[in-house]
Regions:
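Conserved beta-alpha-beta core of the PfkB/ribokinase-like small-molecule kinase fold
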Residues: 152-232, 248-250
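Conserved phosphate-binding/catalytic loop of the ribokinase/pfkB sugar-kinase fold
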Residues: 102-106, 117-163
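Glycine-rich phosphate/adenosyl-contacting loop at the front of the ribokinase-like
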Residues: 1-78, 88-89
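A glycine-rich helix N-cap at a beta->alpha junction
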Residues: 93-110
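Short, conserved phosphate/pyrophosphate- and ester-handling motifs at nucleotide-, phospho-/glycolipid
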Residues: 68, 214, 275
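Hydrophobic beta-strand scaffold residues
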Residues: 75, 101, 183-184, 241
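Conserved phosphate-binding/catalytic region of the ribokinase-like
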Residues: 1-7, 12-13, 26-32, 37, ...
Length: 324
């Protein structure tokens, strides 16, 4: 019997969110809407210049896991935090969300990762990530039994940045496939895709069963400005792709079918975690045996909830929302 519906593997990060004008981004040389990796000195400098904000447990795959658990899925998560105050906050929060988190903390090394997120007046988020303890996630941290017992192992594309984590990522895919399970990957960020395009393309083509990407990410992967062209390539290379297009909704592709899913109407407050929530809704429905069109509807409902408030974790009753 499958003990988990979804097992997420990603960078365990504490988010620090604050509002910021475009001038703030320009002053610090940030590319609006992107994610940049920063060192400890830059993290201190940017943090000191940020206005009032909120701290909450984050990380892309962890956000997906929390939202999927809120939708009733049985969920686990693997990611590395330090044995420090932020690490304890992360562990408490993800356990409180109903997600199993067995990874042992890092002792005596780098601090727990944090992501400094600047939310612009138009709701766009610009992220600056200090990976800290994240980079130490390795194959020794993999829970092979959990991976083998999960319907879907969900891998966060940001793990292509730390070499040890990328190796763990590939090992997890091998374990999942050896057990006859499915592997999903989210591309995470167009800049991350550009840093590791060849590795991403090979993984998507040869090792992944399910792909999540937004318009910018899928176009970056296939080096085109044409979404339709990128979608056509994706359809030929992967069993199942869910491609999001913000207010244009999403496109769900198999080798022989295409489902267009409308975006749910909502007021955009903060786009942080929209893609994470979309993946959560989709995978929660998929592992519950729903049809693909219904998976897309759950995904759109979850994404709309995520962007309707400040912060990435759900604040409304997602089960009630998808029951609609």
């Amino acid at each position: 019997m499958t003990s988990l519906d979804i097992l997420g593997i990603g960078n365990a990060i504490v988010d620090v969110l604050a509002r910021a004008e475009d001038a703030f981004l320009a002053r610090h040389g940030m590319a609006k809407g992107g994610m940049a990796l920063i060192g400890p000195d830059d993290a201190e400098r940017i943090y000191a210049d940020m206005g009032p904000g909120i701290e909450s447990s984050g990380g892309s795959a962890a956000n997906t896991c929390a939202a999927a658990a809120a939708l009733g899925a049985k969920v686990g998560y693997l990611g590395k935090v330090a044995d420090d105050a932020l690490g304890q906050v992360f562990r408490h929060d993800i356990n409180a969300a109903g997600v199993r988190f067995p990874t042992a903390p890092l002792v005596g090394g780098a601090p727990t990762a944090r992501c400094l997120i600047l939310v612009s007046p138009d709701g766009q988020r610009t992220m600056n990530t200090f990976l800290g303890a994240c980079v130490t996630l390795g194959e020794a941290d993999l829970d092979e039994a959990a991976i083998a017992a999960a319907q879907v192992t969900y891998l966060e594309g940001y793990l292509f940045d730390p070499p040890a984590a990328q190796a763990a990522f590939r090992a997890a895919a091998r374990i999942a496939h050896a057990a006859g399970r499915r592997v999903a990957i989210t591309l995470s960020d167009p800049f991350c895709v550009e840093r590791h395009r060849d590795a991403f393309r090979a993984f998507v083509r040869d090792e992944a069963d399910i792909l999540f990407a937004n318009e910018a990410e899928i176009c970056a992967l296939y080096q085109t400005d044409n979404f339709e062209a990128a979608a056509t390539i994706a359809q030929s290379e992967i069993d199942l792709a869910a491609l999001t297009r913000s207010e244009k909704g999403s496109l769900i592709l198999t080798a022989t079918t295409a489902h267009e899913v409308a975006a749910e109407a909502t007021t955009v407050v903060d786009t942080t975690g929209a893609g994470d929530a979309y993946a959560a809704g989709f995978l929660a429905a998929l592992t519950a045996g729903r049809e693909l069109a219904e998976c897309g509807r759950w995904a759109s409902v979850a994404a709309a909830e995520a962007i309707s408030h400040f912060g990435a974790r759900p604040q409304a009753d997602l089960k009630a929302l998808v029951a609609g």
